[in-house]
Amino acid sequence: VNKMKPKALFVMLILWLSFTTIQARSTEDVPDKGTYAKFLLVGCYMKPDEEGVRMYRFDGQTADVDYPCGLRGISNPAFLTSDSTGNRIYAIGDDEGKSSTANALLFDKESGLLSLLNSQSTDGELPIYITLSPKEYFVLTANYKGGSITVFSQDKKGKLQRDTKIIRFAGNGPNKKRQEQSHLHCVTFTPDGKFLLATDLGT
């Protein structure tokens, strides 16, 4: 499948995790460097033995960037999302076969370190997008080559469970080279949380 990928390694989504060291202070206080610190999470097309998820610390006052850590263990974690707290990060494994995965990560705000909680197969090849349900009970992936959406539940610690539900799409489109089958690109909920929307390149 001729799936379009960006030419650069640094990919698709940069998460601005706007937490860290902001504290109440008067307008006369001189802010220290940490006051403006934000974390950037970058997903990359990289092999599992490389740091495909990268954490950068960005200073909003000086625009200085440093690289405190990265995370190995995921094949092509090219799209990331976070929960509402910023403590849990979710990444796709944009690959085929057993390497087609959804991945749950923990982010420690104090240390700025990432850790991999667990990975589960999407049972749909080339997952390209990942999102959370409105109440964050479920994690969903859009699987490009699989032509499907995979729905994962999570336990209280944020680990993805194996009891998946798969929504499969069928059909094709007028461009026989690109639309020979369903190719899911994105899945998201409407603002009221009542409906799930999906975009399909293949039909």
Give the location of each predicted region.
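Short glycine/acidic-enriched loop and turn motifs that connect beta-strands
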Residues: M46-D49, D95-S99, K145-S148, T203
